[in-house]
Regions:
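Short loop-to-alpha-helix "cap/lid" segments that border enzyme active sites
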Residues: 110, 126-134
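Short acidic/histidine-rich active-site segments
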Residues: 140-156
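Short, glycine/charged-rich beta-strand-loop motifs at protein surfaces that mediate ligand recognition
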Residues: 94, 119-124, 148-152
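Residue-level preference for long, well-ordered alpha-helices that form the structural scaffold
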Residues: 8-12, 154, 170
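Mid-to-C-terminal alpha-helical segments outside catalytic/metal-binding sites
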Residues: 158-192
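Short active-site-adjacent structural elements
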Residues: 124-128, 151-156, 185
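Extended substrate/RNA-proximal surfaces in nucleic-acid metabolism proteins
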Residues: 3-117
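Conserved, mostly hydrophobic/aromatic
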Residues: 92, 147, 181
Length: 192
């Protein structure tokens, strides 16, 4: 695992350098923060997870396994949040509610000081909207993600997702989500 994390970080740095060199000077593009949607792996709490955090933060965007979650996996998330003081963001939790066991474990995890980041696409589809809205309301720290991978098959769609949150949960809820995002991406003074 150590080698794969190190290799990933090197590839990310090279890609970021290429991106920065392609952006014209004085561009009005948003700030780009190096980060990772880190896939859960056993023992990750012992492998310097801060290297996978959003740059200069303690925010760890964590993708849980696409399987039935175990007690050990849930315990690792608790250790990352409570003992190691990471701001854990469970990304696209709606993908893991395929079983009542995972749904129950997700509800347990949502009681911890962590965030749930629901994909905007989930809110834009009638068949998944209700679950996405319920997950946003389940956590004290709701977030909206685009899960954008390209401009065709998985394009950015935050505008539509934000509008759905505004319509269904209200302007104050959307403002709180924006504040959560600002807080979790703001540089932290001390790295624990």
């Amino acid at each position: 695992r150590e080698n794969s994390v190190t290799m990933y970080l090197a590839r990310r740095a090279a890609a970021l350098n290429a991106l920065h060199s392609a952006i014209p000077a004085g561009s009005s593009l948003p700030r780009i923060l190096p980060a990772a949607e880190a896939a859960y792996f056993r023992g990750m709490e012992e492998h310097h997870p801060e290297r996978l955090c959003i740059e200069n933060t303690r925010t760890l965007m964590l993708e849980m396994p696409f399987s039935e979650w175990t007690d050990q996996q849930v315990e690792t998330v608790a250790v990352l949040s409570l003992d190691l003081h990471f701001n854990v963001v469970l990304v696209h939790p709606e993908r893991f509610c395929f079983s009542s066991s995972n749904r129950r474990r997700l509800e347990e995890l949502a009681k911890l000081p962590l965030a749930l980041q629901v994909n905007a696409d989930t809110l834009l589809r009638w068949g998944t909207r209700r679950q996405g809205l319920e997950l946003l309301e389940l956590t004290a720290t709701p977030l909206l993600g685009s899960d954008c991978h390209d401009m065709t098959k998985r394009p950015p769609n935050l505008k539509g997702g934000r509008e759905m949150v505004r319509r269904k949960l209200g302007e104050a809820f959307l403002a709180q989500m924006d504040e959560n995002a600002r807080r979790l991406t703001a540089p932290t003074l001390a790295q624990v």
